[in-house]
Amino acid sequence: MIDKTCADPVAAIQPIGDGASVMVGGFGTSGIPYGLLNALAEKGARDLTIISNNAGEGEAGIAALLKLGLVAKVICSYPRTPGSVWFERRYKAGEVALEVMPQGTLAERMRAAGSGLGGFFTPTGYGTKLAEGKETRVIGGRGYVFEPPLSADFALIRGETGDRWGNLSYHATARNFNPVMAMAARHSIAEVRQVSTEPLHPERVVTPGIFIASLCEYAVRP
């Protein structure tokens, strides 16, 4: 019998060790897997590469990992926000490396990884510092830069409802980067507001269970 459920976030994140690359779902403060991130902070895995849209806000989530000095590199599209205090402290101190890319490029690189594609050419960033060191081409009279697929060892994502097979649904805009990260990572871990005892209706499934290694219930909605 397939049952991908874990007792709690602490059990779910046990496979994550030092030096891992970790995709983290969320956009701003919506759809962030706070339960899994808090458990990862408590575990203390170090030298992490965090891939997310933002670089954390306040004291929780990604910010908690930065505060504890567990992050070696951040890959994101929007590192500075009014609440990104811990990222700014670590970055200015030279303790965290940063790779920035346009938001659409970030999403498409992950989608390419999840779809088994070898990368893509995009006009976004052509002729700017973001294109330095990358392959460029002129196609149809327009400049393009090549972007490779972006994968990760793990993805931590937040869903609304899941079943024991790992099928997930999402709540409104809390969906954001979560589905594409679930596909792009080699080992995806989900927290959901509710684990259903019955299979999710196929029309409700956004992320099929084939992409989810494990899931746990974390009822608190940030």
Question: What residue ranges belong to the model's regions?
Answer:
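Conserved alpha/beta enzyme-core scaffold
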Residues: 1-222
